[in-house]
Amino acid sequence: MKDNQTEVESRSTDDRLKVRGNKVGKKTKDPNRPKKPPSPFFVFLDDFRKEFNLANPDNKSVGNVGRAAGKKWKTMTEEERAPFVAKSQSKKTEYAVTMQQYNMELANGNKTTGDDEKQEKAADD
């Protein structure tokens, strides 16, 4: 027993400190599920990262790139952000279509693997 604790209190404290394993009802992620589309900022970040790395080839810090991108994004006007917003919207519509196809395949019981899709693309080429 611990200092000034009864046996019951001691046991309940020990039970709370135990490491818990995986939750019983936790779902695993489907590797074939389409990735969510990027936000306008992340579309901007892809372009900005390329420019930043060309301007600062000796920079190894990911944080510096993110900080600089965030500062620039905050100072941009709506007109400057418009191409990134448009690209993000087009990716959202593509995502909606691919998710609809994915959900139809799941409903039909056809789970496709990435290997099958790669083989189909290779056959088309």
From Swiss-Prot:
This is High mobility group B protein 5. Belongs to the HMGB family. The keyword Zinc does not apply. GO terms for molecular function: chromatin binding; DNA binding; DNA-binding transcription factor activity; structural constituent of chromatin. One of its GO terms (biological process) is chromatin organization. CDD domains: HMG-box_AtHMGB1-like. Binds preferentially double-stranded DNA. Confers resistance to salt and drought stresses. Residues 34-103 bind DNA. Mostly expressed lateral roots, root tips and flowers (including pedicels, but excluding ovary), and, to a lower extent, in cotyledons, hypocotyls, stems and leaves. InterPro entries: HMG_box_dom, HMG_box_dom_sf, HMGB_plant. Its main location: nucleus. Keywords: DNA-binding, Nucleus. Residues 1-18, 113-125 have a biased composition (Basic and acidic residues).
